[in-house]
């Protein structure tokens, strides 16, 4: 009888522990949504700044002169594909398949790293041609907006590498699930922001 009571108490303790993890995870994700709202304000401010400065060429080049749309299209494809592969990683996580999570995260990381490599190349090329952020208001707004997005993607890649290490070492724990959910929100958010950047900065700049 006493063993049954002890078993019931232990089961109740485990159930309460799981509920605590669930509630804590929900609060963490909610808090991360609030952070993303502040990031929305940041990018909205940068878009507004770019819109104001987009016609200030100061005798320098316009977007039509310097943007290579085919190059940026490939860059965009990398980021869009990384968003899809991250979705596959999340599906594997819900299935509890550690190897699948790590595999898809690795693919996502490679796509994200390819995106950043192309962005660094673009910035280096523009600066080498004398079209750095100090050249005109238009270029200042461009470098501020695109550069800030690039820094966010870099932070996401670092976060992703940390998650790969933690999941490889500790498995798919409740904490890892919560952190992956937050990272998923962050990564998809950056994808949406980049679509806006591609449309407003590059596409409209070339047309």
From Swiss-Prot:
Membrane-topology descriptor: Multi-pass membrane protein
Periplasmic compartment segments: 48-70, 121-141, 207
Descriptive protein name: Cytochrome bo(3) ubiquinol oxidase subunit 3
Topological domains, Cytoplasmic: 1-26, 92-99, 163-185
Molecular function per GO: cytochrome bo3 ubiquinol oxidase activity; cytochrome-c oxidase activity
Localization (cell): Cell inner membrane
Keywords per UniProt: Cell inner membrane, Cell membrane, Electron transport, Membrane, Oxidoreductase, Transmembrane, Transmembrane helix, Transport
Complex formation: Heterooctamer of two A chains, two B chains, two C chains and two D chains.
CDD domains: Ubiquinol_oxidase_III (cd02863)
Top-rank lineage group of the source organism: Bacteria
Function: Cytochrome bo(3) ubiquinol terminal oxidase is the component of the aerobic respiratory chain of E.coli that predominates when cells are grown at high aeration. Has proton pump activity across the membrane in addition to electron transfer, pumping 2 protons/electron.
Family, as annotated: Belongs to the cytochrome c oxidase subunit 3 family.
Keyword Oxidoreductase listed: yes
Listed transmembrane segments: 27-47, 71-91, 100-120, 142-162, 186-206
Main location: membrane
The keyword Disulfide bond is annotated on this UniProt entry: no
Pfam family, one: COX3
One Gene Ontology cellular component annotation held by this UniProt entry: plasma membrane
GO biological process: aerobic electron transport chain
């Amino acid at each position: 009888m006493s063993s049954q009571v002890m078993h019931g108490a232990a089961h109740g303790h485990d159930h309460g522990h799981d509920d605590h993890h669930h509630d804590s995870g929900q609060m963490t994700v909610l808090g991360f949504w609030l952070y993303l709202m502040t990031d929305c304000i940041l990018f909205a401010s940068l878009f507004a700044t770019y819109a104001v400065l987009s016609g200030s060429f100061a005798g320098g080049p316009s977007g039509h002169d310097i943007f290579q749309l085919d190059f940026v299209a490939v860059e965009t494809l990398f980021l869009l594909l990384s968003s899809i592969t991250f979705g596959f990683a999340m599906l594997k996580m819900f299935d509890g398949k550690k190897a699948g999570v790590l595999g898809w995260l690795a693919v996502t990381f490679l796509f994200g790293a390819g995106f950043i490599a192309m962005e660094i190349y673009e910035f280096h090329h523009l600066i080498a041609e004398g079209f750095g952020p100090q050249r005109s208001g238009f270029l200042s707004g461009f470098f501020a907006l695109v550069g800030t997005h690039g820094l966010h993607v870099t932070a996401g890649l670092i976060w992703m590498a940390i998650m790969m290490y933690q999941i490889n070492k500790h498995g798919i724990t409740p904490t890892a699930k919560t952190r992956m959910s937050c990272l998923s929100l962050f990564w998809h958010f950056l994808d949406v922001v980049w679509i806006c950047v591609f449309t407003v900065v590059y596409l409209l700049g070339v047309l």
